[in-house]
Amino acid sequence: MQVVVFKVNDEQFAVEASKVQSINDMMEITKVPKSAVYIKGLINLRGNIISLLDINLLLEIEQGTLTQENIIILNLAEESVGVTVDQVDEVLEIEEDLVEKVETDKKRGYIKGVINFKDRIVTLIDIEKLIKK
């Protein structure tokens, strides 16, 4: 399985690469008045208007001191959605058995498990569950 590893406020997360359409540098965001608090706004990506979500709010992580540098565009149920992250680190090929299941409460049901990879632990998230919550 391939995963895209990214950082949010010094924590490392991963999503399955099959869900990732593209990785882009930060671009101009158009704010949407009276939208849900987790919606950062809209971006125009090669003529396509895409909703941009604040992954910090979805993951319930405080905004870090770093500027969010990247946008990950995800393909979810025939819809493209973007999430802003501090930094995209790498794309890794991992064996399924490296993913350790973790007990989580229903509130954190979007966590698929943790990847104990070399000298670090990366949280693998089910991005569809996270966005639907």
Question: Predicted regions: what is each one?
Answer:
Residues M1-K133:
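An acidic, low-aromatic, low-complexity terminal/linker signal
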